[in-house]
UniProtKB/Swiss-Prot annotation:
It comes from Dinoroseobacter shibae (strain DSM 16493 / NCIMB 14021 / DFL 12). This is Chaperone protein DnaJ. SMART domains: DnaJ (SM00271). Residues 5-70 form the J domain. It is found in: Cytoplasm. The gene is dnaJ. Pfam families: DnaJ (PF00226), DnaJ_C (PF01556), DnaJ_CXXCXGXG (PF00684).
Length: 383
């Protein structure tokens, strides 16, 4: 019985793209899978036929041979592309192989692990993380910082190829560049990573002496990083392409800089706002006055203290906080008063305070209010 055209089997045209071929296969595989067609005696044969067609059309080399020679390209004894490891011809079209292939394409890594990964000649380098501690002043101003980052770079001797003299790798003779081989174990066909090329699909005949064929080498690089004004602890800065070098010419990873702003000895930060706790004397709080306070940019501001101020009272200096990270405004600075009780009093100071207390019974509303509340509480307990 003559074989059907592989394109007709998958329901696609001869000019179909790889994605269209894959979609056609997935559709047919779902329709024809034996588990869903227990009442159709032809389902298994049609299922294997679809898998056989996809096995040819998904591979550019096999597809080119099929487009040129048709089914004859894969018949035994022909000059068709029959690669080592059982990839060339239709003898592998048994149900076990078909079952494996359909689950590879329908469910990816769940059943197939890293199948087909050997065809990827290049791989992206790893991302790197760098923790950077800066002061609050540096976070306020922004800065240009030079950091030393250990990692891997493309080997300068072989230009990342891994081969001596920068020569290009050659196709692995064991798997013909597929990165995987198949072995028959009873009813099942087992697919595994090619032991010769470790799944890369290529081998290096003369490894580079400097990097021993890795194509990369360890190196600590000095990088200049722009820290924008307004960063805070947890801010992440991404430097694209500054991570580890890629494998076999693949793109480099990225470098992520995580900012940690040190605690300040004067200011506490909450978002864009700054808080500064300023001690004032008891007389300044009672009589009023003014106090000079520092600002984060290194300047000074005078703040008026209203008479009768209590501990915890806050006064705002607008626009004296931290800048927003992307220039959207500036926070404020809050001055919190801490009224200081005098210590180590002289006899004269004690006498004056006692005289003051005797004269100030009507000048302490909060104290009077508190003790009236306490007296009312006690009276209520007695009744």
């Amino acid at each position: 019985m003559a074989k059907r055209d592989y394109y007709d089997v998958l329901g696609v045209s001869k000019g179909a793209s790889p994605d269209e071929i894959k979609k056609g296969f997935r559709k047919k595989a779902k329709e024809l899978h034996p588990d869903r067609n227990s009442d159709n005696p032809n389902a298994e044969a049609q299922f294997k036929e679809a898998n056989e067609a996809y096995d040819i059309l998904k591979d550019p080399d096999k597809k080119a041979a099929y487009d040129r020679y048709g089914h004859a390209a894969f018949e035994n004894g022909s000059g068709g592309p029959r690669g080592p490891g059982g990839f060339g011809g239709q003898g592998q079209g048994d149900f076990a192989s078909a079952f494996s292939d359909v689950f590879e394409d329908l469910f990816g890594d769940f059943m197939g692990g890293q199948r087909g990964g050997g065809r990827q000649r290049a791989a992206r380098g790893s991302d790197l993380r760098y923790n950077l501690r800066i002061t609050l002043e540096q976070a306020f101003m922004g800065m240009q910082k030079t950091i030393s980052v250990p990692g891997t770079v493309s080997c300068s001797a072989c230009e990342g190829t891994g081969a001596e003299g920068g020569a290009e790798p050659v196709v692995c003779p064991t798997c013909s560049g597929m990165g995987k081989v198949r072995a028959q174990q009873g009813f099942f066909t087992i697919e595994k990573t090619c032991p010769t090329c470790s799944g890369m699909g290529q081998i290096i005949k003369n490894p580079c002496q400097a990097c021993r064929g890795a194509g990369r080498e360890e190196k600590t690089r000095a990088l200049s990083v722009n820290i924008p004004a307004g960063v805070e602890t947890g801010t992440r800065i991404r430097l694209a392409g500054e991570g580890d070098a890629g494998v076999r010419g693949g793109p480099s990873g990225d470098l992520y800089i995580f900012i940690e702003v040190e605690e300040h000895r004067i200011f506490q930060r909450e978002g864009l706002d700054l808080y500064c706790r300023v001690p004032v004397s008891m007389t300044s709080a009672a009589l009023g006055g003014d106090v000079e306070v520092p600002t984060i940019e290194g300047g000074r501001s005078r703040v008026k203290i209203p008479s009768g101020s209590q501990s915890g009272r806050q006064m705002r200096l607008r626009g004296k906080g931290m800048p927003a990270l992307r220039g959207a405004g500036t926070g404020d600075m809050f001055i919190e008063l801490a009224v200081e009780t005098p210590v180590n009093l002289t006899m004269r100071q004690r006498e004056l305070l006692r005289e003051f207390e005797a004269e100030s019974q009507d000048n302490q509303p909060e104290t009077s209010k508190f003790f009236k509340t306490v007296k009312s509480f006690w009276d209520g307990m007695k009744s």
